[in-house]
């Protein structure tokens, strides 16, 4: 049976926060304007609540930030053996741009990522997580949003 989504437990925040510096960025998938999956690594992924992640999208009007306005469903994959928290997680949820979080998400991003968007042309994207499936120190786990 699945547990409730709890991204703030079991070392998940540390695993996500240090993923980029350990060379294990989170991959984010969304459906592009042509109806095809688009997958990219996101070094700015952050846990911002028990069932929410945030990332910095470097552009507001193209790519991920534009696509989620019409197609908010996203998938994420993390693989970080030997690091803190789970070794593997597959997550799914719904994303939306949230300019009210721009300052906080940009400031929490690694310097190398901020250097890619020094003029802050991007926007914070918040992902409400519905499901997390993974493998941690205690074996496989499943977390799902409860109604």
What annotation goes with each model-predicted range?
Residues 1-147:
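Binding-site signature for planar aromatic cofactors or substrates
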